[in-house]
């Protein structure tokens, strides 16, 4: 039996599910009557999604489709950081959506401060873009997870690496 138990708090997403969601968006764009002739492009890069279309109204429709497809694939809406809409050539608009991955130092400090303030038997340490939480009892860790799920952070939190 281990003397201490721990888990990691990370902010990540399933890349393959995102690829599938973007593929579904592209398929939807080709089949929807109102979007068929807009020459809308959706390109998935390593750290961003680029959308190019003919109007801001169409862009908003693509946003809604992307959010819907991502939600159906259990991807959090918090991974999308919508950039500003730029004008492109030929009366077109373009927007880059940055994909958020990892917990920033500020958010990691907020999480560890919350854990230190509310749970005296639990230790939290920041390790790069993750937070490691450890305690002597598994029950304490489960209470911490429940408490963190109640908070609303600007990134999606996942709890991994249970030991």
UniProtKB/Swiss-Prot annotation:
Keyword Nucleotide-binding: yes
InterPro entries assigned to the protein according to its UniProt record, in alphabetical order: DUF520 (IPR007551), UPF0234-like_C (IPR035571), UPF0234_N (IPR035570), YajQ-like_sf (IPR036183)
Single GO MF descriptor: nucleotide binding
Coiled coil segments of this chain: none
Pfam families xref list: DUF520
Superkingdom, natural source: Bacteria
Transmembrane recorded as keyword: no
Keywords: Nucleotide-binding
A GO term from the CC aspect: cytosol
HAMAP family according to UniProt: YajQ
Family the UniProt entry places it in: Belongs to the YajQ family.
Physiological role: Nucleotide-binding protein.
Name this protein carries in UniProt: Nucleotide-binding protein all4662
């Amino acid at each position: 039996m281990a003397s201490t138990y721990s888990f990691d708090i990370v902010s990540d997403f399933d890349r393959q599910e995102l690829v599938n969601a973007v593929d579904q968006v592209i398929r939807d764009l080709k089949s929807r009557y109102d979007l068929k002739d807009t020459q809308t492009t959706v390109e998935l890069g390593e750290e961003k999604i680029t959308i190019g279309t003919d109007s801001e109204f169409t862009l908003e429709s693509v946003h809604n489709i992307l959010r819907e497809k991502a939600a159906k694939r259990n991807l959090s809406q918090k991974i999308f950081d919508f950039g500003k809409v730029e004008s492109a050539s030929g009366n077109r608009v373009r927007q880059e959506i940055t994909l958020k991955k990892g917990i920033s130092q500020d958010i990691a400090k907020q999480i560890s401060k919350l854990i230190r303030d509310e749970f005296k038997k639990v230790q939290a340490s920041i390790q790069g873009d993750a937070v490691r939480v450890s305690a002597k009892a598994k029950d304490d860790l489960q209470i911490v997870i429940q408490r963190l799920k109640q908070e609303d952070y600007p990134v999606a939190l996942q709890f991994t690496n249970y030991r």
